[in-house]
Structures are given as structure tokens and as C-alpha cells.
Amino acid sequence: MSRYRLNRPMALEEAAVLPDGAGGHALEWHALGTLWAELRPGAGRERRGEIAPEGTMLFRIFLRAAPQGSPQRPRPDQRLREGARIFRILAVSEADAAGAYLICHAREEVPA
């Protein structure tokens, strides 16, 4: 039996830089697939945003492992989405000695 409860479907997304038609570029996110995860909250804080205060919350997200280089293995330049919630991946490592699970350290930013 697993010590992780992978009961939340989360979309793994990757950014693509596209021309915006005005000489610049726009960032567009597209889904690579769905991963089942367990979400564990960490520390949170409030900081000054451009318009209003912003809350920043850190999370640990546990997933089934995938080999290095696999498109199913998250990377720090990607993000996980659960509905309207977006979690930017900061770091990825093995969660257990057997290498059966991964832990993604992620940040969710929401308006306060």
C-alpha cells in the first residue's frame, strides 16, 4: 500500500513562446497530460503586489515517478494546474529511497 494518496488529477503544462504579431512575443501554456497527485501545503506569506497584496503559498506535490528525460516527469520550467489553481514547479526530486515517487516543490500565487 502506498503512503501517498494520489487522488487529485492535475494537468502538467509547458510554456510555448509565440509571436504576438506586434514584434514581441506572448507566453502560451499547453497541457502535456494528466498526472495523479497528492497536495500537501507548506509555508505561506503575504507580499506587496503591483496593485494589491499577494499571498504566496508553498506546496509539496507527490506524484508517481518517471525516468529522467521522460515527458511525464515534471521540470522546474513547467507548472501543474488543478482547475483554476496554478502551481509553478520550483524543484523536482525523488520522494523515497526506492525512486517510486517524485516530490515537486511548487508555489501557488493568489491575490490576497
What are these regions (language model features)?
Residues 1-25:
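Active-site-proximal polar cores
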Residues 24-112:
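Short, conserved turn/kink motifs that form compact alpha/beta structural patches or helix kinks used as
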